[in-house]
Swiss-Prot record:
InterPro entries assigned: aa-tRNA-synth_II, aa-tRNA-synth_II/BPL/LPL, Fdx_antiC-bd, Fdx_antiC-bd_sf, Phe-tRNA-synth_IIc_mito, Phenylalanyl-tRNA_Synthase
Catalytic activity: tRNA(Phe) + L-phenylalanine + ATP = L-phenylalanyl-tRNA(Phe) + AMP + diphosphate + H(+)
Name of the protein in its database record: Phenylalanine--tRNA ligase, mitochondrial
Enzyme class: ligase
EC number, as in UniProt: 6.1.1.20
Organism in which the protein naturally occurs: Schizosaccharomyces pombe (strain 972 / ATCC 24843) (Fission yeast)
Described purpose of this protein according to its UniProt entry: Is responsible for the charging of tRNA(Phe) with phenylalanine in mitochondrial translation.
Residues reported in the UniProt entry to bind substrate: S115, A116, H117, Q118, R143, S150, H151, Y152, Q157, M158, E159, E271, F296
Pfam families for this protein: FDX-ACB (PF03147), tRNA-synt_2d (PF01409)
GO CC terms in record: cytoplasm; mitochondrial matrix; mitochondrion
NCBIfam families: pheS_mito
Residues making up the signal peptide according to the UniProt record: none
Length: 429
């Protein structure tokens, strides 16, 4: 991926992360850059008072009545089999690409979702004799992505699941009645997913009645949890704003049917979470025979940006006390921006080859410039008569913590140009 680094990684050797205790064998698949290495072990979801930690704690409180195991997964290193194969991802799935996933080597990677731990936690329920009805997993996850104010290569998810024995229909019906009594369900909700029988998106092993029960329990529960959480935001609790929700269909390899919950926030529909009825093969593989259940995954940064009014996802990783001292544990408060430093725009244009992937370009920018780039936008695309294609990107340099000097930016831009040319084998213009 980055030839000037991979050349010395092709020979297996042990590498110890700066913030991690575990030795990892690397090979030609290794594509984890230093700016990612340095953040492993920061564990923002355990840092008391940090918005991500507070959001985790508030969500755990919301789900407390369901008697679930609360799990925090510190090590992000998982096997490729755990991250993809066990959940039913096809071998050709785009998310397996080195342009999408950070690989330690050809057999291990940095988890791309908390769903990687579902099989392990389902097995735990069975081994412990169903002392708990489900689980909540919180962890940091890693994906190569674009550069802007709402995307970052490391973010945090909470995964949750709840199961029932299919023979205990009385408990299933009673549980549904309980969640259906929630006054939060009176909030404005549009549901486009009621006609499951006509959508042809059910598992053959489950009856229509079972599928409808689990789907409704899932939607009622999550609507209540998210509504009650969002109501803690100062702008909502004061009555200054109203919130609407809607359910739509989605698709995931490990749930069927699958849904997503969206929130109408300031006139724009935003996806808050994905969820669905757990695939029976996952439950059986974990020793949960004749069980049915639901699962969901929430991106904590997306929710925190809404609730706290945090405008830039980079701020979650800031060490600036002007950020960290604004927040108290288990409390949602509105972020107060500190001085916004001036921006500086620099353009970079190049002729691409057939192997070019934008995520590889974005990764180089993050590795060279760290968190000093606010956004990267494609501003021009041109195809010559020869068939060659040229792209021009605008790089917006802006630090969250200090003013950047012109000479500093010029040096970064020159370093970036050299890395792009050498690593991506493109022709600079």
């Amino acid at each position: 991926m980055f030839p000037h680094r991979v050349s010395h990684l092709s020979k297996l050797f042990s590498r110890r992360f700066p913030n991690w205790k575990r030795k990892v064998q690397t090979d030609s698949w290794s594509n984890v850059p230093e700016h990612i290495h340095s953040k492993i072990g920061r564990n923002l979801f355990q840092k008391e008072g940090h918005p991500i930690c507070s959001l985790r704690q508030l969500l755990e409180q919301q789900f407390q009545k369901f008697e679930m195991n609360n799990v925090q997964k510190e090590s992000p290193i998982v096997s490729v089999e755990t991250n993809f194969d066990s959940l039913g991802f096809p071998k050709t799935h785009v998310s397996r690409s080195k342009s999408d996933t950070y690989y330690m080597n050809n057999k291990t990677c940095l988890r791309t979702h908390t769903s990687a731990h579902q099989p392990e936690e389902f097995s735990r329920l069975a081994k412990e004799g169903f002392k708990k009805n489900g689980f909540l997993i919180t962890a940091d996850v890693y994906r190569r992505d674009e550069v802007d104010s709402s995307h970052y290569p490391i973010f945090h998810q909470m995964e949750g699941a709840l199961v029932w024995n299919r023979n205990d229909t009385a408990k299933m019906k009673n549980d549904l009645k309980k969640v259906a009594l929630s006054p939060s369900l009176k909030s404005m909700v549009d549901d486009e997913t009621t006609a499951l029988e006509t959508h042809n998106d059910m598992q053959d092993i489950y009856s229509l009645e079972e599928t409808k029960f689990v789907s409704q329990h899932l939607k009622d529960t999550l609507t209540t949890v998210i509504h009650d959480l969002v109501s803690l935001a100062p702008s909502i609790s004061s009555g200054a704003e109203q919130v609407r929700y809607r359910w739509t269909y989605d698709s995931f390899p490990f749930t069927k049917p699958s849904f997503q919950l969206e929130i109408d926030w300031k006139g724009k529909w935003l996806e808050i979470l994905g969820c669905g009825v757990v695939q029976d093969r996952l439950l059986k593989g974990a020793g949960l025979n004749n069980y049915i259940g639901w699962a969901f995954g929430i991106g904590l940064e997306r929710l925190a940006m809404i609730l706290y009014g945090i405008p830039d996802i980079r701020l979650f990783w800031s060490l600036d006390e002007r950020f960290s001292k604004q927040f108290l544990p288990n409390k949602i408060s509105t972020f107060k921006p500190f001085s916004k430093y001036p921006a500086c725009f620099k353009d970079i244009a190049f002729w691409i080859n057939n192997d070019f992937n934008p995520n590889d370009f974005y990764e180089i920018i993050r590795d060279v410039c760290q968190d000093m780039v606010e956004s990267v936008n494609l501003i021009d695309q041109y195809t010559a008569k020869s068939g060659k294609t040229s792209l021009c990107y605008r790089v917006n340099y802006r630090s969250m913590e200090r003013s950047l000097r012109n000479e500093e930016i010029d040096k970064l831009q020159e370093k970036l140009r050299n890395r792009v040319a050498n690593s991506l084998r493109v022709e600079l213009r």
